[in-house]
């Protein structure tokens, strides 16, 4: 999508867009392609970095849980995915696709964000990854991760002293 379309054609925006654009050819100028797929790892990284930067979120610690509140405007429950990776990384992602165009309609301005939404959060050690719940209401996703109960303090072990 072009910055001109949004009225953001400035030298700064052009420079930023140029830095974020990834060519479709080899991954590097020397043709160093470690992925074997034309630099797709680089494109994936840039796409994911853009998605993470554009997805606002709040993290709250509650008495018995952690709450992750993520804006996911225009996404339905079928478009949102919540996963726990590597046993300690909470991944919230989704994708908003362009609506079907009407033949007789012409966009004069498109400001709503299309594309991928994603955030990754490293969970604290006391988070119970088996007790994760997610609710989406009015474009706001709330993921709740319960805390593990605090470990009980160890009681001192009494050793019987025998008289010899």
From Swiss-Prot:
It holds the Pfam family HSP20. GO terms for molecular function: unfolded protein binding. Belongs to the small heat shock protein (HSP20) family. The lineage of its organism: Eukaryota, Viridiplantae, Streptophyta, Embryophyta, Tracheophyta. Keywords: Cytoplasm, Stress response. InterPro entries: A-crystallin/Hsp20_dom (IPR002068), HSP20-like_chaperone (IPR008978), Small_HSP (IPR031107). This is 17.8 kDa class II heat shock protein. Signal peptide: none annotated. Disulfide bonds: none annotated. It is found in: Cytoplasm. The keyword Cytoplasm applies. GO terms for cellular component: cytoplasm. It comes from the Eukaryota. One of its GO terms (biological process) is protein complex oligomerization. It comes from Zea mays. Residues 48-164 form the sHSP domain. PANTHER family: HEAT-SHOCK PROTEIN 20 FAMILY MEMBER (PTHR11527). Its main location: cytoplasm.
